[in-house]
């Protein structure tokens, strides 16, 4: 999450990768996020304009622009695969995984950033990996940007209600308001790093992946319900034993 690391190293790393791909005739498939998109409720498409503010957003926009430029270069095949916030099994790292799912797994109160009423679009990490592999192995998918496929958007409140149904128990949660993050960031570096990303949580997040879905209509997107079954499979057995 260290912004200075992003600022000083990420573009250099990308340049090295581009040059290595050119020298070895390798194709470049770049996994990207949505930091460079405008942080409001405007629906996000592959050709949405970059409107960014902050170190991370700026770095990501520059990297994406660099790759788009290379898409015109006949010496390299480039593809950008873009995804919204992750959620997933094992050690998946994301704000929602850390503050919601992992805390519920550990019988802690979930912490929801800014609002439990705005729509969130999340991508299941195994789906993201499979979709990238599928795109990478097609002859006609390079030199363009793709939004990776996601299930329907939900509010945090809707997610928690479904979790309660799955776990057969109440899920406690607390909404962390903007002023709380502002105060905490004075004393905590991790909260300082998080502040740049918070504006997106004030609005419905509308990430459109219709381009992918039309190209691959048979691709099976993991539903949020099925993802929860995976995330909480051990906990489900535990709570079942407790109820006896």
Locate the predicted segments by residue.
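A short helix->loop->beta-strand "cap" motif at the edges of active sites that frequently abuts
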Residues: 21-28, 75-76
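Conserved beta-loop-beta element that borders a ligand/cofactor-binding pocket
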Residues: 33, 65-90
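Active-site "gating" loop of Rossmann-like NAD(P)-dependent oxidoreductase/epimerase domains
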Residues: 34-55, 69-76
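A conserved pocket-lining segment of Rossmann-fold NAD(P)-dependent short-chain dehydrogenase/reductase
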Residues: 102-123, 135
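Glycine-rich "substrate-gating" loop/helix at the edge of Rossmann-like oxidoreductase active sites
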Residues: 84-94, 114-126
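NAD(P)H-binding glycine-rich loop region in Rossmannoid oxidoreductase-like domains
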Residues: 1-24
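Mid/C-terminal beta-alpha module of Rossmann-like enzyme folds, strongest
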Residues: 131-194, 209, 214, 220-224, ...
């Amino acid at each position: 999450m260290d912004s200075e690391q992003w600022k000083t190293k990420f573009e250099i790393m990308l340049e090295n990768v581009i040059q290595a791909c050119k020298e070895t005739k390798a194709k470049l498939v770049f996994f990207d996020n949505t930091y460079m998109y405008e942080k409001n409720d405007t629906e996000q498409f592959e050709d949405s304009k970059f409107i960014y503010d902050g170190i991370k957003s700026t770095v990501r926009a520059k990297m994406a622009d660099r790759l788009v430029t290379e898409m015109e270069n006949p010496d390299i095949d480039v593809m950008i695969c873009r995804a919204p916030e992750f959620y997933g099994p094992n050690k998946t790292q994301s704000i929602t995984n850390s503050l919601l799912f992992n805390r519920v797994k550990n019988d802690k109160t979930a912490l929801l950033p800014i609002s439990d009423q705005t729509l969130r679009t999340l991508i299941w990490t195994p789906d993201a990996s499979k979709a990238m592999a599928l795109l990478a192995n097609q002859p006609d998918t390079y030199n363009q940007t793709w939004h990776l496929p996601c299930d329907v958007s939900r509010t945090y409140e809707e997610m928690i209600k479904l979790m309660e149904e799955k776990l057969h128990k109440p899920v406690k949660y607390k909404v962390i308001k903007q002023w709380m993050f502002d105060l905490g960031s004075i004393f905590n570096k991790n909260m300082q790093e998080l502040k740049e990303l918070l504006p997106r949580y004030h609005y419905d997040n509308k990430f459109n992946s219709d381009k992918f879905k039309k190209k691959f209509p048979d691709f099976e997107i993991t539903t949020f319900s099925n993802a929860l079954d995976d995330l909480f499979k051990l906990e489900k057995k535990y709570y079942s034993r407790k109820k006896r």
